[in-house]
Structures are given as C-alpha cells and as structure tokens.
UniProtKB/Swiss-Prot annotation:
Residues where N6-acetyllysine is found: K17
Species whose genome carries this gene: Chlorocebus aethiops (Green monkey)
SUPFAM superfamilies in alphabetical order: Globin-like
Modified residues (Phosphoserine): S4, S36, S50, S103, S125, S132, S139
Name this polypeptide is given: Hemoglobin subunit alpha
In-chain residues carrying the UniProt-annotated modification Phosphotyrosine: Y25
Subunit organization: Heterotetramer of two alpha chains and two beta chains.
Modified residues (Phosphothreonine): T109, T135, T138
Keyword Transport found: yes
Family (UniProt): Belongs to the globin family.
UniProt KW keywords: Acetylation, Heme, Iron, Metal-binding, Oxygen transport, Phosphoprotein, Transport
Name of the gene this protein is made from: HBA
Biological function: Involved in oxygen transport from the lung to the various peripheral tissues.
Length: 142
C-alpha cells in the first residue's frame, strides 16, 4: 500500500503526539488483542498475560519501538524492519492475520487516547501505515 505525502505527514504527526506513552499504548493494544482475540495468546505461552503484567508491558514497548522505527523510516520500511520480519517469519512463525488484529487494536487504543487528533483523515492514514507495516512484516513468509 502506497502512503501519500499527506498520509506520511498524518502518521508522523499522530505518532509524535503519542510521545512518551508509546510503550504504554503498545501494551494496552496487546491487552486489547488478547481479550478480543483469545487465540492470539497461543504465541505467548510463557507470558503472564494478566492486566499490567511486566511481560506484556515489555512486549508492548517492543511493538511501540518497532512502530517508531517504521515511522522514522516510512520511505524504506522493508529495509528498516527486515530483521523483525525475519524473526516473525522464521523463528516465531506468527500467523500473518495476527498483525491485522494487532493493528486494529492499536487503532482503537490510539483513538481512545487521542480523540482530538484522531480525525477521519488521520484514522485512514494510520490504517494504511499499519497495513504497510503488516505487509512488510509478512513479506518473508512468501
């Protein structure tokens, strides 16, 4: 999916508003995913998946850091996320549909925390961005 200059601007501005809350929002999105789509828990059998767990917070920070990297390299996400794509495809073997589920939960989390900034245009841009990230992360599956 091609991001327009307006999409890139919207994504960078929205992610800039996330600021120091990125890890917190990442963890919240994971919790939403585990509650809404319980089958996603199977990839985390060794985690304490309870609300506020240190492991979920830690993984939420990893998710947020990866998204921050993607935002910073929006014009070259395949290169920037190559190692992460390898990890998920070859070692973790995550079902690609789970990226879409997490993307949805991230959108809900961002909308809940940034209602003024979450305009229809920003929503559409973030959705396209997360779909692009998902495409990059699943590219090594083929």
């Amino acid at each position: 999916m091609v991001l327009s200059p307006a999409d890139k601007s919207n994504v960078k501005a929205a992610w800039g508003k996330v600021g120091g809350h990125a890890g917190e929002y990442g963890a919240e999105a994971l919790e939403r995913m585990f509650l809404s789509f319980p089958t996603t828990k199977t990839y985390f059998p060794h985690f304490d998946l309870s609300h506020g767990s240190a492991q979920v917070k830690g993984h939420g920070k990893k998710v947020a850091d990866a998204l921050t990297l993607a935002v910073g390299h929006v014009d070259d996400m395949p290169h920037a996320l190559s190692a992460l794509s390898d990890l998920h495809a070859h070692k973790l073997r995550v079902d690609p549909v789970n990226f879409k589920l997490l993307s949805h939960c991230l959108l809900v989390t961002l909308a809940a925390h940034l209602p003024a900034e979450f305009t229809p245009a920003v929503h559409a841009s973030l959705d396209k961005f997360l779909a692009s990230v998902s495409t990059v992360l699943t590219s090594k599956y083929r």
